Amino acid sequence: KQKSAYLAGSMRALRSLDREAPDRDLRDALTALPGVGPKTASWVVRNWRDSDCVSILDIHILRAGRMLQIFPEGKSVERHYLELEAAFLDFAEAISVKASILDSVMWMNMRQIPAAILRRLADPSAEVFSPKAEPVQLSLAL
């Protein structure tokens, strides 16, 4: 029921949206739509306009950004999206890589790393795996 209300409200609001607005302004306008957050709005702008003025931040990009020390600990995409996005875009510019390429590569690589390895990277004292059974001594003697 709530989704249908969001959709109906969004459809009405889309009619008055300035589709010629600069990329960030368009993203911000999209976040005013019911049920649309900055990640979704950035995804729309990035893919509709092939924009490198916004970035699509999620947990994978956040983890990679923390590993590279471009995102400080304690910041979340839910509460600090624009601050993290600014840091990400500055980093992309500093290394002369399009933001769209950088977040795509980071996302593809980070999502393939097993959770146990990510825990170990975040906390060097964390166990990489927990054995389920006692190890068995094998013998090759005939």
Language-model features, listed with the residues they occupy:
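Alpha-helical ds-nucleic-acid-binding substructure associated with the helix-hairpin-helix region
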Residues: 1-34
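Alpha-helix N-cap and coil->helix boundary residues
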Residues: 2, 21, 25, 56, ...
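Short helix-capping/linker segments at secondary-structure and domain boundaries
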Residues: 14-21, 50-53, 70-71, 110-118
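Phosphate-backbone recognition surface of nucleic-acid-processing proteins
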Residues: 45-95
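A residue-level signal for conserved active-site and pocket-lining positions in enzyme catalytic cores
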Residues: 7, 61, 102
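A basic, often C-terminal nucleic-acid-binding module that engages the phosphate backbone, implemented
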Residues: 12, 78-142
